[in-house]
Regions:
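Short amphipathic alpha-helical interaction segments
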Residues: 54-68
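Short cysteine-rich clusters marking metal-coordination/redox-active sites
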Residues: 128
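Long, low-complexity, charge-rich intrinsically disordered regions
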Residues: 120-123, 133-249
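Short amphipathic alpha-helical elements of helix-turn-helix/winged-helix folds
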Residues: 33-37
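Short acidic, hydrophobic short linear motifs in intrinsically disordered regions
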Residues: 39-53
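Short, amphipathic alpha-helical interaction segments positioned at domain boundaries
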Residues: 85-118
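A short, conserved structural fragment
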Residues: 68-79
């Protein structure tokens, strides 16, 4: 069911942005290093991250305890990082392949902005939670190159101030858990009607604007990517993916 007076994608980002973590320059470097080391496909220990940053392991442990980093990190029993900021080295719903290595993302949105941080093209495969149909995307550092099926959409949930900045468990269960790719708008509407959630919306390639804001706004100066994230790519039907229509979740 469509929600009356749905937000535009710009309006959504204006609402979401204040809730996202900000990073100091040294925290940006740690965050980008975490993403890039995780993209190698295995858990990260302090020594590995220290080598990547050229600093002592003791300094790494202190940096990982900063609130902005800690609230986006989860680790195994030995303290090795298994996931950070939407990227995981352990299985989740959204498969995210980079350079032939199998990774996963916490939600559908993560797969749109992380390629820019990694400076790598990702092949995404994510089951529609309503029908089981696999939504496939090729996402480069600068654009969404292809989407199949062409009518695919992505759902979003309105941000809650109590979610962000608390814990990884909260972010995943109360935010990421409602952000999926659907093979069609109708599928998304059906899924959220059944779930009886009332604050989700479907957007599409318009989210390129949002992923640019996140990747550049949070990690500006640490990503090292030139160029623009505008455009949908020759293989992506932006009109289909940018309806901006809303669904009741």
């Amino acid at each position: 069911m469509l929600v009356p007076n749905p937000p535009t994608s710009d309006g959504y980002w204006e609402t979401l942005w204040p809730h996202l973590r900000s990073f100091s320059p040294d925290e940006q470097r740690v965050a980008v290093a975490l993403y890039r080391e995780l993209s190698k496909g295995a858990a990260i220990d302090d020594a590995q991250l220290a080598r990547a940053l050229g600093i002592a392991p003791a300094e790494i442990r202190a940096l990982l305890q900063r609130d902005s980093i800690k609230s986006l990190t989860y680790a195994d029993g030995e303290g090795r990082v298994l996931g950070f900021g939407g990227l995981a080295a352990t299985p989740m719903h959204h498969r995210f392949e980079v350079d032939g290595r199998e990774l996963w993302t916490w939600c559908a949105w993560d797969s749109l902005f992380i390629p820019e941080i990694l400076r790598r093209t990702a092949h995404v495969a994510s089951p529609d939670p309503e029908t089981g149909e696999i939504v496939r995307l090729v996402v480069s550092p600068g654009e969404i190159k292809s989407v199949k099926p062409a009518k695919a959409v992505i759902s979003f949930i309105r941000p809650d101030a109590q979610i962000f900045g608390t814990s990884v468990a909260n972010v995943i269960s109360r935010f990421c858990h409602f952000i999926f790719f659907f093979a069609s708008l109708e599928s998304g509407e059906n899924a959220f009607a059944l779930a009886k959630r009332f604050n989700a919306h479907n957007f599409g390639a318009e989210l390129l604007v949002g992923r640019q804001r996140l990747a550049r706004g949070s990690f500006d100066g640490s990503i090292g990517v030139a160029g623009s994230s505008r455009g949908s790519g020759s293989g992506c039907d932006a009109r289909r993916l940018s309806t901006g229509r809303s669904i009741r979740a």
